Amino acid sequence: TKDEVKIGNAAKRAMVTNPKNTISFVKRLMGADFNDENVKKMQKLATYDIVNKSGKPYVKIDDKEYSPEQISSMIVGKMKKVAEDYVGEEIKDAVITVPAWFGDAARTATKTAGELAGLNVLRVINEPTSAALAANLMEDKKDKTVVVVDSGTGTVDVSVLELSDGMAEVLASNGDVYLGGKDYDDAIVKWVVDEFKKSDDVDLTKDNMAYARVVESAEKAKIELSSSTQTEINLPYISMKDGAPLNLAMTLSRAKFESLVKNLNDRTVEKAKVAVEKAGKKYADIDCI
């Protein structure tokens, strides 16, 4: 907004009510040239304006233009503050993780974003390596071959790692920069909207505030279904019809959810298969995923 920078859940809520000034998936623009095919695709999908400035993609908000590094630095700066509040002291140094498929330009742009946020970036490392460290897969220093599947908000990255003597080598990577958690959310949103249209003859996509509530509830439902076999989606006073308020109450089972996202799961599995093949490995060679 004109008064403050909203990051995280506050920004997600603004995605529906203020889409023109809400920036998402800026990671896809990091280190890119304006004429890159990926930038052209982003221009079609983004709710905000992506403009050409000296051959580089910039994000336009009102009458100002920001580089992807500047936008990313705002997010990094927010996380720096969160970390400082947690440990109770200033944080100066950082190691930043990036997808294994990031090229040199994207890695340099990421380092720049960290520096703009006031950090001394010690290293930029691959996310799969970081995942292996976090999962304690390298502690025993035994040789093993690991597949890391990293499903983010808007991308899925699959990497095959060779772990040996406490070191990690990326043998192969594969991924899709247009497949991630948001696609799973969108599948639930579409189901809710379609079901409500059938039962109450009201299109919730026509009401920005109602649609924003559905989007928020879809993500919560997805998270709950990770540990439960079913979840309730209850949104009282979601809309009005003939002067009377309408309530939305639906039950979504895990089985139904899995059927809604089967094509997404199939795409992820296919990415993993290709990564294993690129690494020159067979399924029997994989020690863990």
Predicted regions and their residues:
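Oxyanion-binding/catalytic loops of NTP- or PPi-dependent enzymes
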Residues: 1-44, 49-54, 60-74, 81-289
